[in-house]
């Protein structure tokens, strides 16, 4: 009998060990309270999110990608795994309005309801996210928003785990006082008729970065918070300064979206910068939600391509971002290492290496061609291999097909390469960049590439509005500029990328 027991125990241990990457479930032990059972109804006290006992609470979790694209990852099984294995206390369901979202595909709302019902059963908080993005002004679909939030608040107004996010990322020619605040007042009024208590989060200008503007003209509702969004590879101390200003004005902040990547969603990951951000959020007890739960082949995704859609993920199923985020939600010491990439924009660039000079071949504000002329100069003491160097000219293509011609290059037009890149998330003054490179050649210390004259045009030859383009300025002589950025093997070495 003892021998049989010994054999059984040995087999059991072998079985457990061979499960290898299967992860422990810290929240699944019998008797563990769910986040909602533990904290109950949330409210605002000063700038702080607090639970039913008035104690500060910091929610941590993850956001879906667009429900219309990656909705299969949003289900009770996956959310249960995230609660039990990752330790999430909040899940954000990102329901796009445009881009195949609810405006054109009303059935997406059913996936939102599925997410809320699953969160209710699992006892986690859930953010109902009206995910405006390419439709940058929330007023564009205001009546649809009011209709949607009327329905959601009537269904879930007595459910303490529901949080409403009524405008994901206002952007473009939008400001707080004229556009966002009046919109928010109308939508909040609709929600409050059915739900007097639950938290409402309002997006801020410039893709939810301008919390300072919202802080200067605050909404009157006692349980409203302002959304702050950041991507660790793009946004640094300048954005934390905005957050500090908002807090000093008594405006509560909820980070409903942040990524370990750059703002495109697909550069990085930037783990050192992410650690700096999370340390800051912890110091202020600011709640956060990471972007995103999907297997999309980009660096901000938490899962590797082909990962299960219902949870049960091994460590080997998680991306570098997913591994980092899971460990930081759990509060364990992360063991991940940075993947070398472009550094954060607020890091100092190399001043004594190569630089770029620019002049406008066509200074017209409205023209059917953009004609940048530039030359790259080696200010350092060592020879530069040009095949490792690329330059980016940042501008607005407005979703039109792009073409480029080389009119003249001292190094030879045949030695110059080009690539157009559309940004995942438009930046201030740019939704596209033209990347210029070289097939071969070197730059000795003190040498220059000489003049490179380019000409861009739309497929339909329609006009550009250059005045709003990040890299453009009107000059008929060459001037040094940091708004055309330079890279050595993909690493930023000169200039400042747009916000």
UniProtKB/Swiss-Prot annotation:
Belongs to the glycosyl hydrolase 5 (cellulase A) family. One of its GO terms (biological process) is cellulose catabolic process. Residues 1-29 form the signal peptide. InterPro entries: CBM2/CBM3_carb-bd_dom_sf (IPR008965), CBM3 (IPR001956), CBM3_sf (IPR036966), Glyco_hydro_5 (IPR001547), Glyco_hydro_5_CS (IPR018087), Glycoside_hydrolase_SF (IPR017853). GO terms for molecular function: cellulase activity; cellulose binding. Residues 350-499 form the CBM3 domain. Substrate binds at residues 65, 69-70, 96, 131, 231, 263-264, 291, 296-298. This is Endoglucanase. Its EC number is 3.2.1.4. The active site is at 169 (proton donor), 257 (nucleophile). Keywords: Carbohydrate metabolism, Cellulose degradation, Glycosidase, Hydrolase, Polysaccharide degradation, Signal. Coiled coil: none annotated. It comes from Bacillus subtilis. It catalyses: Endohydrolysis of (1->4)-beta-D-glucosidic linkages in cellulose, lichenin and cereal beta-D-glucans.
């Amino acid at each position: 009998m003892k021998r049989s027991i010994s054999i059984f125990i040995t087999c059991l241990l072998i079985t457990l060990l061979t499960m290898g990457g299967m992860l422990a479930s810290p929240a699944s032990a019998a008797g563990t309270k769910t986040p909602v059972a533990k904290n109950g109804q949330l409210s605002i006290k000063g700038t702080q999110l607090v639970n039913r006992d008035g104690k500060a609470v910091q929610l941590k979790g993850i956001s879906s990608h667009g429900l219309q694209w990656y909705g299969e990852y949003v289900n009770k099984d996956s959310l249960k795994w995230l609660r039990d294995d990752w330790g999430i206390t909040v899940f954000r369901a990102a329901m796009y309005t445009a881009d195949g979202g609810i405006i054109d595909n009303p059935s997406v709302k059913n996936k939102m309801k599925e997410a809320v019902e699953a969160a209710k059963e699992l006892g986690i908080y859930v953010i109902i996210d009206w995910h405006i993005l390419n439709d940058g002004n929330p007023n564009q679909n205001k009546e649809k928003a009011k209709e949607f939030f009327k329905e959601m608040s009537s269904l879930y107004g007595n459910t303490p785990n529901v949080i409403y996010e009524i405008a994901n990322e206002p952007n473009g020619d939008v400001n707080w006082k004229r556009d966002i605040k009046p919109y928010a007042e109308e939508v909040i009024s609709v929600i409050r008729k059915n739900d007097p208590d639950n938290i409402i989060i309002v997006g801020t200008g410039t893709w939810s970065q301008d919390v300072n503007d919202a802080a200067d003209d605050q909404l009157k509702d006692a349980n409203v918070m302002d959304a702050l969004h950041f991507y660790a590879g793009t946004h640094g101390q300048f954005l934390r300064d905005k957050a500090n200003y908002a807090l000093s004005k008594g405006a509560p902040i909820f980070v409903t979206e942040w990524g370990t990547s750059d703002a495109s969603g697909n550069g990085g990951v930037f783990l050192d910068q992410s650690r700096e951000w999370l340390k800051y959020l912890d110091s202020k007890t600011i709640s956060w939600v990471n972007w995103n739960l999907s297997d999309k082949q980009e660096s901000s995704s938490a899962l590797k391509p082909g990962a299960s859609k219902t949870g049960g993920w091994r460590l080997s199923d998680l991306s570098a971002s997913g591994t980092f985020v899971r460990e930081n939600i759990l509060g364990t010491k992360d063991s991940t290492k940075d993947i070398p990439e472009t550094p954060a924009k607020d890091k100092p660039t190399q001043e004594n290496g190569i630089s770029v000079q620019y002049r406008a071949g066509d200074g017209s504000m409205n023209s059917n061609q953009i004609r940048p002329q530039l030359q790259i100069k080696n200010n350092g003491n060592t020879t530069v291999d040009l095949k490792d160097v690329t330059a980016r000219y940042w501008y607005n293509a407005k979703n039109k097909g792009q073409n480029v011609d080389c009119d003249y290059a001292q190094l030879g037009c045949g030695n110059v390469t080009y690539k157009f890149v559309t940004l995942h998330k438009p930046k201030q003054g740019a939704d596209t960049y033209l990347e210029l490179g070289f097939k071969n050649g070197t730059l000795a210390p003190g040498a220059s590439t000489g003049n490179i004259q380019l000409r861009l045009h739309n497929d339909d030859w329609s006009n550009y509005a250059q005045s709003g383009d990040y890299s453009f300025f009107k000059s008929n002589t060459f001037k040094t500029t940091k708004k055309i950025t330079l890279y050595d093997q993909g690493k930023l070495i000169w200039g400042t990328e747009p916000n």
